[in-house]
Swiss-Prot record:
The active site is at 150 (proton donor/acceptor), 249 (proton donor/acceptor). The keyword Transport does not apply. This is Putative hydroxypyruvate isomerase. It catalyses: 3-hydroxypyruvate = 2-hydroxy-3-oxopropanoate. It comes from Homo sapiens.
């Protein structure tokens, strides 16, 4: 079984450094082979591509733009009346992905509108999401890109987020029926919403295109105190044949590099994947 491949989420790691290029360089110096970032749009794609190239890293995941965060938006994919803005954001994400050689884009679903009842608007929001996802699948297919759907927990992190369980996301993916749309499995969110990680990983891994990890409930390093047994979960992913990247999307409890001792231990035990795997 091949060792897992890890990517540094630069929206979370190396907060002690200012600017994405500096964080890219730090990730390379720390042994990562890949990075991911939610929203790279404050930097030019040329600057990011140059930093990644100099650090010998690949960029493997970005998100679609969040929309108007001052108005509380956190993605637009399922938000009624924001279809045009979603498509504009998708075009921007595709431009960045192409310039950066990034193969995956997280298509953010967005939040239930302020003051609306989740149950009352669920059908309308799902219809909007399906419409936008079908459009996105076509756009992404033309560029050989993959779109990802990520359930985000509504118990702690974002009570208004529309897409909050792997079951809901898998059902939507089945309705869209496009092979270049896949599931993004953030183990932090899945544990909070449903638990049953062994069963859910085995059930949904065939449609998973990217994995992210953080400890529960504090969202710290996998080695920090919490509910999750990451040596077991990493072994499970290996045993199930997962070949994608595992994104380190957590809040370092102190210095980022010192907090990567868990990853250095994994590499010492399992080795780095061969380049190009």
């Amino acid at each position: 079984m091949a060792p897992l491949r890890f990517s540094a989420n630069l929206s979370w790691l190396f907060p002690e450094l200012s600017g994405l290029p500096a964080r890219v360089r730090a990730a390379g110096s720390s042994g990562f082979e890949a990075v991911e970032v939610a929203w790279p749009y404050a930097e030019t794609p040329e600057a990011l591509a140059r930093a990644a190239r100099e650090a010998g890293l690949r960029l493997v995941l970005i998100n679609t733009p969040p929309g108007d965060q001052e108005k509380g938006e956190m993605g637009l994919g399922a938000v009624p009346g924001r279809q045009a803005a979603f498509r504009e954001g998708l075009e921007q994400a595709v431009r960045y992905a192409k310039a950066l050689g990034c193969p995956r884009i997280h298509l953010m679903a967005g939040r239930v509108p302020q003051g609306a009842d989740r149950i009352a608007v669920k059908a309308e929001m799902e219809a909007v999401f399906l419409e936008n996802l079908r459009h996105a699948a076509g756009v992404l297919a033309q560029e050989d890109l993959v779109g990802l759907l990520e359930p985000i927990n509504t118990r702690i992190t974002d009570p208004q987020y529309f897409l909050d369980t792997p079951q809901q996301a898998a059902a939507i993916l089945q309705k869209v029926g496009r092979p270049n749309l896949q599931l993004q499995m953030d183990i932090f969110h899945w544990q909070i919403m449903d638990g049953n990680l062994t069963g859910n990983i085995r059930e949904f891994l065939p449609i998973v295109g990217h994995v992210q990890v953080a400890q529960v409930p504090g969202r710290g390093e996998p080695s920090s105190p919490g509910e999750l047994n990451f040596p077991y979960l990493f072994q499970l992913l290996e045993d199930e044949g997962y070949k994608g990247f595992v994104g380190c999307e957590y809040q370092p409890r102190g210095d980022t590099v010192e907090g990567l001792s868990w990853l250095r231990s994994y590499w010492d035990r399992r080795g780095h994947p061969e380049a190009g795997q």
